[in-house]
Amino acid sequence: MVEEETESPGPKKCGPYISSVTSQSVNLMIRGVVLFFIGVFLALVLNLLQIQRNVTLFPPDVIASIFSSAWWVPPCCGTASAVIGLLYPCIDRHLGEPHKFNREWSNVMRCVAVFVGINHASAKLDFDNNIQLSLTLAALSVGLWWTFDRSRSGFGLGVGIAFLATVVTQLLVYNGVYQYTSPDFLYVRSWLPCIFFAGGITMGNIGRQLAMYECKVIAEKSHQE
């Protein structure tokens, strides 16, 4: 009788593994949405900076009207930002290469500020030739990685992102999907890979910080249970 009473049915609860998987999938979606909107916002901000140089990747009226011919560019940047931001912490876990620095949102915000500054420099500074511009922006981009990342996976992924994004952008231009407003096409190609590299490092840092915050919340919940 005692055994029957102890085995009396009650409301069954999900095991810790199932609840953990569910919460992780929800948090993954939340992180993806946050990264998407951050990417869209940065795309619009950086485009405003490039308008000063008249070399925008999409026409200025894309901000004023959603029916612009290049309305799809900010959502594409947001999607790429979400993928990059989710990919960085995933690769860190698989490679077992934790970040070397104590992560804080203040460091992430400084990284974003430096990235915007690099883009602003590409729009404002005048150089004698495109090689000087490329070398300067490359040094600034590598400096951003060294200051806020320093991981081999981050550098490799940043280089891969820069190469792939530059190739895709040039293919879109060659196929007439959209075109640069600057007549100096070589000038655009001289800074584009560096901007993509710095952008990949920046979104990777944001994604890592969001993932770290998620792990901290899950650990606190499991500790309370």
From Swiss-Prot:
GO terms for biological process: cellular response to insulin stimulus; cholesterol biosynthetic process; SREBP signaling pathway; SREBP-SCAP complex retention in endoplasmic reticulum. Keywords: Cholesterol metabolism, Endoplasmic reticulum, Lipid metabolism, Lipid-binding, Membrane, Oxidation, Phosphoprotein, Steroid metabolism, Sterol metabolism, Thioester bond, Transmembrane, Transmembrane helix, Ubl conjugation. A motif (KxHxx) lies at residues 219-225. Disulfide bonds: none annotated. The chain crosses the membrane at residues 29-51, 71-88, 104-126, 130-148, 154-175, 190-207. Residues 1-28, 89-103, 149-153, 208-225 are cytoplasmic. Residues 52-70, 127-129, 176-189 are lumenal. The modification Cysteine sulfenic acid (-SOH) is found at C215. The modification Phosphoserine is found at S151. It is found in: Endoplasmic reticulum membrane. The record marks F115 as: Required for the recognition of 25-hydroxycholesterol. Phosphorylation at Ser-151 by PCK1 reduces binding to oxysterol, disrupting the interaction between INSIG2 and SCAP, thereby promoting nuclear translocation of SREBP proteins (SREBF1/SREBP1 or SREBF2/SREBP2) and subsequent transcription of downstream lipogenesis-related genes. GO terms for molecular function: oxysterol binding. GO terms for cellular component: SREBP-SCAP-Insig complex. It is a multi-pass membrane protein. InterPro entries: INSIG_fam (IPR025929). There is a cross-link at C215 (Glycyl cysteine thioester (Cys-Gly) (interchain with G-Cter in ubiquitin)). Binds oxysterols in a pocket within their transmembrane domains and interacts with SCAP via transmembrane domains 3 and 4. Oxysterol-binding protein that mediates feedback control of cholesterol synthesis by controlling both endoplasmic reticulum to Golgi transport of SCAP and degradation of HMGCR. Acts as a negative regulator of cholesterol biosynthesis by mediating the retention of the SCAP-SREBP complex in the endoplasmic reticulum, thereby blocking the processing of sterol regulatory element-binding proteins (SREBPs) SREBF1/SREBP1 and SREBF2/SREBP2. Interacts with SCAP; interaction is direct and only takes place in the presence of sterols; it prevents interaction between SCAP and the coat protein complex II (COPII). Associates with the SCAP-SREBP complex (composed of SCAP and SREBF1/SREBP1 or SREBF2/SREBP2); association is mediated via its interaction with SCAP and only takes place in the presence of sterols. Interacts with RNF139. Interacts with RNF145. Belongs to the INSIG family. This is Insulin-induced gene 2 protein. It comes from Callithrix jacchus (White-tufted-ear marmoset).
